[in-house]
């Protein structure tokens, strides 16, 4: 028996979502089919509204519906500390911990040469002008192979800019994502972060070359 074309199309589109395979997409499609029409219309409206109103913050690249995100627009935040994360969901997770009052920078991914993701595919270059002498940059990428490789690449790139660089570590499970780590563990991870590079005299003239020329650690 063949599925109707409209159902096949729905399953195909749902399977494009992260973490959703063909079988999960099929279950979701049947679930949606069984829901009242008004529920489906409300879901469709919410999707269209989010796509219309949401964009990335021009400073930190977090998701926002305003000119700047709430963190960048808050003058009470610590302007001398920047926490670098992989995805917008990581910002929400760290904010829930209540242990961090600095700024953020969202990369929207990690380095993954095997998947064709190099530095030019991430929001790395816009980070460089935000970092200066006497600041601290917390590298809070995940503890996956790609997350560690991205942190090492950023460390090498940021060291000449004169900032102290630390790596989130304590309590975050190996191979884990910050988005799925509980707030207590994340709070301890921030408090127990380890310095990986002390401040050095800034070398601003090499910014452009560094962004393109620093070696990308190979992911295993």
From Swiss-Prot:
A zinc finger (C4-type) spans 57-72. GO terms for biological process: double-strand break repair; recombinational repair. One of its GO terms (molecular function) is zinc ion binding. Residues 80-173 form the Toprim domain. Residues 190-220 are annotated as: Disordered. InterPro entries: DNA_Rcmb_RecR, Hlx-hairpin-Hlx_DNA-bd_motif, Rcmb_RecR, Rcmb_RecR_Znf, TOPRIM_dom, TOPRIM_RecR. Keywords: DNA damage, DNA recombination, DNA repair, Metal-binding, Zinc, Zinc-finger. HAMAP family: RecR. NCBIfam families: recR. Belongs to the RecR family. May play a role in DNA repair. It seems to be involved in an RecBC-independent recombinational process of DNA repair. It may act with RecF and RecO. This is Recombination protein RecR. The gene is recR.
